[in-house]
Amino acid sequence: MITALWLVSALSALVYGGLWVLGPVSPLRTVIKMVPVAALALIAYLTGPRHGLALLLPAALALSAVGDGFLAGDPKRWLPLGLASFLVAHLIYVALFWSASAPSAISEPIRGALIVAAILGGLGMLTWLWAHLGAMRGAVSAYVAAIVAMLATGLLLPWAAWPVMVGALAFMASDAILSADLFVGAKIAGSERLSGYAIWALYYGGQAAITLGLMGLDL
């Protein structure tokens, strides 16, 4: 069952990335986009103890899948709801990562340096976007704070959970590329296709890595 769900998740991610990432808005495209991370949520639920902190992972993944559905639609209509879904998902990740953090992690210089780099990266991105955000300034500022907190708390996990750290970084990179595209119109090498592929690959890869990494911890 779990192996089948991993296959469903990975194959639907490949199908969406290969055929629909730049496709027109449609109900089918929305469903296909939601399936990969929804399958990860089901995997996390079925393989976890189904109580306490372990339920935070499937909850964050399920909210992310809902966010995927909103962002598959018309951004002018659904972007605020998509941002809200992912904002709550990030806050759940923050709570989960913090609760599972290594006791001495905060005192390790390398982690401190990485966290400072994450904060500076978030501030730099927000500064660059600021003039283009208009009425979305408050919402985007809250979102950037949440995803930086998600990456920072992920960096406090035991080193054995390194896939979570890589996944959180990939997630933030995906959001940075998406934000540059949505608000500034900036694309990788001027290519909408390259940007679309990068956004999806980093996002799905990040979520899969977070799922794998947390499944290896005793939550």
Whereabouts are the PLM-identified features?
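Polytopic alpha-helical membrane-helix bundles and their juxtamembrane interface segments
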Residues: 1-219
